[in-house]
């Protein structure tokens, strides 16, 4: 059966499908990647999405499809915000032919035990999206039918439209599991993926290795070979035409109201220039945040703290998360860049740093120190590295992994908003900051989360603010406009260029 591409249609009517599983490590990320690659090879413009706030899976989705992956989170975003992100992504550029949404953890895992808030299932219902369910079928056959039956009946408003069996040991294994699922549940098995080590993606201590680092470590040829191998396995094991039929069965969506993705009133020239750190050490950004900065009137200029000798001509900085601890030697060696950033901070340039960016702005980072309360990894030698020093404190790689939503309130006016503004964000890190002086000031009071010290986050010196909180501009709508306003004021205060 042939399936025509649907360029030019509205976002609410394009085919879409959500790939989920019963738990993490079932294979949904690799299978999602392979399906995206297979459809791109057929000429489809695939718009990828990731449920929840992960940065790493989206880096692969973006690499494969050539379209920026977007995050959808039902705890941070309301229903209109989710529809807004979805529509904006699908309509960007020349539009998309199909949307593929990768879920997070198990289908029903979320913020609470007694509701679907923050879950993959919640996103499936908001987007009226059929679900293709991945099962790690290693060592199970008939039990797979019981698993699908339970997931199918748990919430009748979630449509499980197809099953992919992963980690299949052989033909007999596949036959028994497929027959049982289709007989007892009526859900078709559309794919059978054999056990194959080439379906594995390298791990990093916060999850998968980001695509940018994967390409750097494997080399362009090795990276492409790995992705091509995954695509070949998917093409052999999955009925891609049936997958497209399921995507095409999605019901139409209504358009979001009052889209945030509209040019801000008064946005025009002169446009303040905001420098965004983007390289192997810093690459954790939500693309929506960058789009919103541009819509608020900013001109975006990318730079590399690892490779560039100094800052470009900019009016503000946004240094996102990443793995500065893995590139601490390179960051320390680039003394001219560290000095350039510290001088910009002292001059009052607005500098906003999240997580890895916060770590970079502190005085030093210690890695690989074995012992209680510290993180030890063979890939990080025991050492201490000098960092920018725009913010006080000593970053230590800690043993306890912090992965949590956070809720905070600004208790002063600053470059990310006004006193009293509140936000929901998330934290995702292995580090902690010690040796913070008593005189240190913070801009954020946390109602939920770990933060930097006690219930405080947003370490602030002058117009420089560093926080463990990752913020999404659709959930915290003051973010982009506040950063652009701060950069515009700094631009106006400088001598004419």
Curated annotation (Swiss-Prot):
Sorted UniProt keywords: ATP-binding, Cobalamin biosynthesis, Glutamine amidotransferase, Ligase, Magnesium, Methanogenesis, Nucleotide-binding
Entry EC number(s): 6.3.5.11, 6.3.5.12
Residues of the GATase cobBQ-type domain: 273-478
GO MF entries: ATP binding; cobyrinic acid a,c-diamide synthase activity
Protein's GO biological process: cobalamin biosynthetic process; methanogenesis
Short name of one Pfam family: GATase_3
Positions of the record's site feature: Increases nucleophilicity of active site Cys: 470
Entry cofactors: Mg(2+)
Keyword Transport attributed: no
Annotated NCBIfam families: cobB, F430_CfbB, PRK01077.1
Family listed: Belongs to the CobB/CbiA family.
Its job: Catalyzes the ATP-dependent amidation of the two carboxylate groups at positions a and c of cobyrinate, using either L-glutamine or ammonia as the nitrogen source (Potential). Involved in the biosynthesis of the unique nickel-containing tetrapyrrole coenzyme F430, the prosthetic group of methyl-coenzyme M reductase (MCR), which plays a key role in methanogenesis and anaerobic methane oxidation. Catalyzes the ATP-dependent amidation of the two carboxylate groups at positions a and c of Ni-sirohydrochlorin, using L-glutamine or ammonia as the nitrogen source.
Domain notes per entry: Comprises of two domains. The C-terminal domain contains the binding site for glutamine and catalyzes the hydrolysis of this substrate to glutamate and ammonia. The N-terminal domain is anticipated to bind ATP, and cobyrinate or Ni-sirohydrochlorin, and catalyzes the ultimate synthesis of the diamide product. The ammonia produced via the glutaminase domain is probably translocated to the adjacent domain via a molecular tunnel, where it reacts with an activated intermediate.
Protein name: Cobyrinate a,c-diamide synthase
């Amino acid at each position: 059966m042939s399936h025509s591409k649907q360029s030019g249609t509205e976002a609410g009517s394009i085919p879409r499908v959500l790939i989920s599983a019963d738990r993490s490590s079932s294979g949904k990320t690799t299978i999602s990647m392979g399906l995206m690659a297979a459809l791109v090879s057929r000429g489809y413009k695939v718009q990828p999405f990731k449920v929840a706030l992960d940065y790493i899976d989206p880096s692969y989705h973006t690499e494969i499809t050539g379209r920026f992956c977007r995050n959808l989170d039902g705890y941070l975003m309301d229903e209109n915000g989710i529809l807004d992100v979805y529509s904006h992504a699908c309509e960007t550029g020349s539009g998309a032919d199909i949307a593929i949404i990768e879920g997070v953890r198990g289908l029903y895992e979320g913020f609470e035990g007694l509701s679907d808030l923050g879950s993959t299932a919640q996103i499936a219902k908001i987007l009226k999206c059929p679900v293709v369910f991945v099962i790690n079928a290693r060592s199970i056959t008939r039990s797979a039918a019981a698993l699908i039956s339970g997931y199918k009946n748990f919430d009748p408003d979630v449509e499980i439209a197809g099953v992919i069996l992963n980690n299949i040991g052989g033909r007999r294994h596949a036959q028994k599991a497929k027959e049982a699922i289709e007989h007892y549940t009526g859900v078709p098995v559309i794919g059978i993926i054999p056990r194959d080590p080439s379906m594995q993606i390298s791990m990093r201590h916060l999850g998968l290795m980001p695509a940018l680092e994967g390409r750097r470590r494997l080399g362009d040829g090795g990276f492409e070979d790995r992705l091509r191998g995954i695509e070949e396995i998917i093409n052999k094991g999955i009925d891609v035409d049936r997958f497209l039929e399921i995507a095409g069965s999605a019901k139409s969506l209504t358009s979001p109201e009052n889209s945030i993705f509209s040019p801000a009133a008064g946005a025009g020239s002169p446009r303040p220039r905001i420098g965004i750190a983007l390289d192997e050490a810093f690459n954790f950004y939500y693309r929506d945040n960058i789009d919103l900065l541009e819509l608020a009137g900013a001109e975006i200029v990318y730079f590399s703290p690892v490779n560039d000798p100094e800052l470009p001509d900019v009016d503000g900085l946004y240094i996102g998360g990443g793995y500065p601890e893995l590139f601490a030697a390179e960051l320390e060696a680039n003394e001219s860049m560290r000095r350039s950033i510290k001088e910009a901070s002292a001059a009052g340039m607005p500098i906003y740093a999240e997580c890895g960016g916060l770590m970079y702005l502190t005085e030093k980072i210690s890695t690989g120190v074995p012992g209680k309360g510290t993180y030890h990894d063979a890939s990080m030698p025991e050492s201490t590295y000098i960092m920018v020093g725009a913010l006080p404190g000593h970053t230590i790689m800690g043993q306890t992994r912090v992965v949590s939503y956070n809720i905070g309130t600004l208790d002063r006016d600053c470059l990310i908003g006004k006193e009293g503004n509140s936000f929901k964000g998330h934290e995702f890190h292995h580090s902690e900051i010690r040796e913070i002086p008593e005189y240190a000031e913070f801009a954020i009071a946390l109602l939920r989360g770990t933060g930097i010290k006690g219930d405080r986050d947003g370490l602030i010196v002058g117009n420089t603010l560093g926080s463990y909180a990752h913020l999404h501009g659709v959930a915290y709508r003051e973010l982009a406009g506040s950063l652009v306003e701060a950069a515009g004021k700094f631009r106006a205060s400088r001598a004419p260029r």
